[in-house]
Amino acid sequence: MKVMECQTYEELSQIAARITADTIKEKPDAVLGLATGGTPEGTYRQLIRLHQTENLSFQNITTVNLDEYAGLSSDDPNSYHFYMNDRFFQHIDSKPSRHFIPNGNADDLEAECRRYEQLVDSLGDTDIQLLGIGRNGHIGFNEPGTSFKSRTHVVTLNEQTRQANARYFPSIDSVPKKALTMGIQTILSSKRILLLISGKSKAEAVRKLLEGNISEDFPASALHLHSDVTVLIDREAASLRP
C-alpha cells in the first residue's frame, strides 16, 4: 500500500485525475471503476479539465460503478446514475452504452446483483478502481462485518452511513435503507486501486487503515490484501496518521 499525503483536497484531486488519465493514455479502452459521494467530485472536475484542455479522450473506455441506492429511478437526482451523468459523463466524450451502474430499481434486486457481477467479470479485471472510505471504514456500501469474499450484493445501510448521506436528501427519512454494491472481492479483483480520503471527519478512518490490522470489522482493511493500492490523503485526513 503506497500512501501519498497531499497538502490540499485540490492537490489530491489533481493527482488522482492524473493517475487516471495516465491509465487511459496507456490503455485507451481501459475499464474504469468509478465511485460517487463528495470525495471523487474534484477528481471528476479535473478529468473534465484534462478532456477540455489536453484533449484527453474517453471515447473507448468502459466504466463500472461501485454501487447504487435501492428504489431510486435512474433520473432521481439522488441516484448515482444521475450523479455520474451530472458530475462527469455529460461533460466528456465517453459512450453512454459503455457506462454500467447497478439498477437499483430492478424488480428482483438479488437477480440484478448476479447480473451485474457477471457483467463486471465479463469485462475482465478493472484497470483502475476509484474508492472513497466511510467513517466506519466502509468501501462501496460494504458495511463493517461484510465478508472479504463478498461479491455484488444487496446491503442494508447502517444508521451512520445513512446519516452521512442525509445531506444529499431532504431528510434522513428520505435516505434509502438499502443499496446494491460491488462486494469486497469484486473490488479486490481490480488491477489497481486508488483510494481517496479527504477531511478531518475521515482522520480516524485513516488512522485505523494505516495501523494495518486486517479485520472484516473495518472493510477498508481488505485493501492491505491487494498488491497495487495507492492511498491519497489530504492534510486534514492525515491529522491522526500513525
Swiss-Prot record:
Enzyme Commission no: 3.5.99.6
Activity regulation description: Activity decreases at high substrate concentrations, which may reflect substrate inhibition. Unlike the E.coli enzyme, is not regulated by an allosteric mechanism.
Keywords: Carbohydrate metabolism, Hydrolase
Catalyzed reaction equations: alpha-D-glucosamine 6-phosphate + H2O = beta-D-fructose 6-phosphate + NH4(+)
Record GO cellular component, one term: cytoplasm
Positions annotated as active site in the UniProt record: D67, N136, H138, E143
InterPro entries documented for this protein: Glc/Gal-6P_isomerase (IPR006148), Glucosamine6P_isomerase (IPR004547), Glucosamine6P_isomerase_CS (IPR018321), NagB/RpiA_transferase-like (IPR037171)
Tagged with keyword Hydrolase: yes
Keyword Calcium assigned: no
Pathway(s) served: Amino-sugar metabolism; N-acetylneuraminate degradation; D-fructose 6-phosphate from N-acetylneuraminate: step 5/5
Signal sequence interval, chain numbering: none
Record note on disruption phenotype: Deletion of the gene has essentially no effect on growth on either glucosamine or N-acetylglucosamine. The gamA-nagB double mutant cannot grow on glucosamine or N-acetylglucosamine.
Gene3D superfamilies (UniProt xref): 3.40.50.1360
SUPFAM superfamilies: NagB/RpiA/CoA transferase-like
Family named by the database record: Belongs to the glucosamine/galactosamine-6-phosphate isomerase family. NagB subfamily.
The name this protein goes by in its record: Glucosamine-6-phosphate deaminase 1
Species of the source: Bacillus subtilis (strain 168)
Annotated gene: nagB
